[in-house]
Amino acid sequence: MASGKHHQPGGTRSLTMQKVSLRVTPRLVLEVNRHNAICVATNVPEFYNARGDLNVRDLRAHVKARMISSQFCGYILVSLLDSEDQVDHLNIFPHVFSERMILYKPNNVNLMEMCALLSMIENAKSPSIGLCREVLGRLTLLHSKCNNLDSLFLYNGARTLLSTLVKYHDLEEGAATPGPWNEGLSLFKLHKELKRAPSEARDLMQSLFLTSGKMGCLARSPKDYCADLNKEEDANSGFTFNLFYQDSLLTKHFQCQTVLQTLRRKCLGSDTVSKIIP
């Protein structure tokens, strides 16, 4: 499995590759840092300019600084099936969601950078086709340097998220040469089409395919909800938890109360793992 070593071609390797290639995507990726009694989960800074040019040098320096920081705990992420990600809602039970969320701290700088790029993708408020292409190119290079199951999982997931942004925002409309995108997250395509539909049909279809009550209520203000959780639970945990992210197409799930509860619990109490796929 994911030993971090290069795998030789063969039946076992092919079967494992097929398993990794299932429609499972790493989502809600944030950096987690702890200092004294403060725990912070935050998006990775925007290491790109208005044209979408990726600042690889500063991004790499940021990742290396995290690797040697005693305050850095890892990247929090959750693995979601394509059918579970409904844009504004999650079609998954809380106990399953909790089991899927991990605090990931790889020993490889390239895997660290792939996580950082995933966080940047999800938090991009106004993504451009130039940025999507640059990020995919960088991910391709990083994956080629690792060539293990974790890098494959992160690469496939990031490519799916980039493809989702490109398709949802029509970023490649009129392009002479289409990029190497896949279909993206399927329910985001439905969400996009329903925005154009008559209101009666839209409401019915959204209730059938894009709404789930499994994860409970949404928070009016994620920041205020986290503050309330701190008041209730600080006496037990000894930590104050803070969340920072950009409100974007791919970060709507941070408005879910159960997501915030699980995120806080995992960031404060989870042991880190060095492999996503053991």
From Swiss-Prot:
Interacts with BSRF1 tegument protein; the BBRF2-BSRF1 complexes oligomerize and might play a role in tethering the viral nucleocapsids to the host Golgi membrane during secondary envelopment. Signal peptide: none annotated. This is Cytoplasmic envelopment protein 1. It comes from Epstein-Barr virus (strain GD1). It is found in: Virion; Virion tegument; Host cytoplasm; Host Golgi apparatus. HAMAP family: HSV_CEP1 (MF_04038). It holds the Pfam family Herpes_UL7. Belongs to the herpesviridae cytoplasmic envelopment protein 1 family. Plays a critical role in cytoplasmic virus egress. Participates in the final step of tegumentation and envelope acquisition within the host cytoplasm. GO terms for cellular component: host cell Golgi apparatus; viral tegument. Keywords: Host cytoplasm, Host Golgi apparatus, Virion, Virion tegument.
